Curated annotation (Swiss-Prot):
Record protein name field: Large ribosomal subunit protein bL33c
Main location, first listed in the record: plastid
Family: Belongs to the bacterial ribosomal protein bL33 family.
UniProt keyword annotations, A-Z: Chloroplast, Plastid, Ribonucleoprotein, Ribosomal protein
Length: 64
């Protein structure tokens, strides 16, 4: 008997300002790995998290 997929899935959050900003502290793009509940949050997730490359809290969006 096969188990069903859980409601929680792993997602990657990526900084939106790192892709467009050229005046960064260091090269690279900030990414966080987290979980989300598929039933409670069916749309793409956006969180304000600290970006070490931009050296400030920025919006991080879910990527595929």
């Amino acid at each position: 008997m096969a188990k069903n997929k859980g409601t929680r899935i792993l997602i990657t959050l990526e900084c939106t300002e790192c892709r467009t900003n050229i005046n960064k502290r260091s090269a690279g793009v900030s990414r966080y790995l987290t979980q989300k509940n598929r039933r409670n949050n069916p749309q793409r997730m956006e969180l304000k998290k600290y970006c070490p490359h931009c050296n400030k809290p920025t919006i991080h969006k879910e990527i595929k």
